[in-house]
Amino acid sequence: MSMMKSRTFCLTLLLAGVFAFPLQGWTADYPKQPVELVAAGDPGGGLDLHARIIDMAFQQAKLADKPFTIVNKGAGGGNVATAYMVTQKGSPYSLQVNTNRVLLNPLNGTTKHTLKDMTPVVRLTAEYEIWVVRGDSKYKTVQDVIADLKKDPKSLPFGIGTAPPCTDQLNVLIPAKAAGVDVKGLKIVAFRGGTDVGTQILGGHIPIGSTSLSELVALVEAGRLRPLVVSSPQRMDKLPNVPTWKESGLDVVLAHWRGIFGTPDMPKEAYDYWNKKFAQMSQSQAWKDILAKNDLQNAFLTGDKFKAELEKDGVLYKELLGTLGMLK
């Protein structure tokens, strides 16, 4: 090898090493500090639950040396959490647990932040919605409720677990519309989490609520609250006596997912790192046991597929809200 070729070859190796080192060093040392997991909901709600079971699964499956720092930002229907993430632009040390509100809120005009202002990392779970009343309520079937709503849509204020638009709200509007109820006349009251909805029902402040089962499992199992219908395609193991919307005569299936989002311009190395870590978590026995205990379905999707699903859902939500006159 000539002197010139030798020098060129050595320089090429040197440059390759220089440009490769930052990536290798970055991933080897990351995370150098605690990673905050921002729950876009208040303590006790579904998103808070997800943040805590994620942390639990990571510890039990030994996927992290340190626990997540869980931060609750439940105000504004999740908008406060998303706005906070925007302020952390480019940071690999902030992750957000959120749901389809990231698509619904911009359509309703409650936030200027859209899917472009976040980095979809993974979808984790799906669960289904219930209509729920107090254990001693006069309403025994969902048909009883719909009959009264047809007479007077304002007669039964519905409690939902977050600010509209949200899945809790859609679980009222979609079946009510399909049943011939004047949905524009419905009275829907938003509370700060499904747990709060349960408290309001038990206190007699509202007669009925629409929320996720996971947020009210203990009260349902104790018989203090009674589900009338579930939005799953088939009956759920935990609710063997509760009919689906389809069994109740309405062609409605509605899933409520939770996923992980990174900051805008999240470093690719961090994106890849968390895709790998959450994939490992989703396959762990610890996670499977936690999902079974909380009656959650594993709906894992990696970043690219998750983003594609979000874009597809965004089109559907826009069409639905437009039909209901809710676009702003």
Q: Which residues fall in each region the model found?
A:
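A ligand-binding cleft/hinge motif common to bilobed small-molecule-binding domains
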Residues: 100-110, 173-180, 207-241
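N-terminal (or domain-start) structured segment
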Residues: 26-117, 164, 181-208, 300-301, ...
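Hinge/capping helix and adjacent helix->loop/strand transition within the periplasmic-binding protein
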Residues: 60, 64-65, 84-94, 106-196, ...
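Bacterial N-terminal signal peptides
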Residues: 10-22
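Bacterial N-terminal signal peptides that target proteins for export
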Residues: 2-12
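Alpha-to-beta junction loops
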Residues: 88-97, 152-156, 202-211, 224-227, ...
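An extracytoplasmic/periplasmic, membrane-proximal ligand-sensing/linker region
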Residues: 32-34, 268-328
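C-terminal lobe and pocket-closing loops
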Residues: 140, 215-283, 294, 312-315
